[in-house]
């Protein structure tokens, strides 16, 4: 997915505010919630007849209904500016960019783990310890289930890929056999 320059500028602004208010992680959760609301009610939020204040009010009411609290004036102002400037179509991009920028700014590292079955807490801890020792940053694990791996895992972080899956082993063996037959 190509991210727009517009979305990245909004994300940068929200990160600055989040850092000052010590709410980087909370704003990430809030932005994810706003993205879900936006995608569910895109017709309403993309309607030019609906005023930005009304859109912001709907977001605020949804927060109060789900979280039993307001997201705060700073976050609501951010959302209102997004609507005033007619940038709501960038909300999904903002959410994705924010997630990765927040991980970076907090000196963490994203670790993509693909497994055939859900990892146990102990397995996650082993991966966390390994990655932290390897790169010196706190890992943020994103787990994906891919039954085609049969067993094992594919771990990606810091530009590295470690494939310890059965499928990976079988592919490697198949390539070796293929090259032996060719030669």
Curated annotation (Swiss-Prot):
Gene3D superfamilies named in the record: N-terminal domain of the delta subunit of the F1F0-ATP synthase (1.10.520.20)
Keywords linked to the UniProt accession: ATP synthesis, Cell inner membrane, Cell membrane, CF(1), Hydrogen ion transport, Ion transport, Membrane, Transport
Top-rank lineage group of the source organism: Bacteria
Compartments, as annotated in UniProt: Cell inner membrane
One GO molecular-function entry: proton-transporting ATP synthase activity, rotational mechanism
GO cellular component, one term: plasma membrane
Membrane topology of this protein: Peripheral membrane protein
TM spans (from-to): none
Task of the protein: F(1)F(0) ATP synthase produces ATP from ADP in the presence of a proton or sodium gradient. F-type ATPases consist of two structural domains, F(1) containing the extramembraneous catalytic core and F(0) containing the membrane proton channel, linked together by a central stalk and a peripheral stalk. During catalysis, ATP synthesis in the catalytic domain of F(1) is coupled via a rotary mechanism of the central stalk subunits to proton translocation.
Subunit-structure text: F-type ATPases have 2 components, F(1) - the catalytic core - and F(0) - the membrane proton channel. F(1) has five subunits: alpha(3), beta(3), gamma(1), delta(1), epsilon(1). F(0) has three main subunits: a(1), b(2) and c(10-14). The alpha and beta chains form an alternating ring which encloses part of the gamma chain. F(1) is attached to F(0) by a central stalk formed by the gamma and epsilon chains, while a peripheral stalk is formed by the delta and b chains.
Family: Belongs to the ATPase delta chain family.
Name of the protein described by the UniProt record: ATP synthase subunit delta
Organism: Thermosipho africanus (strain TCF52B)
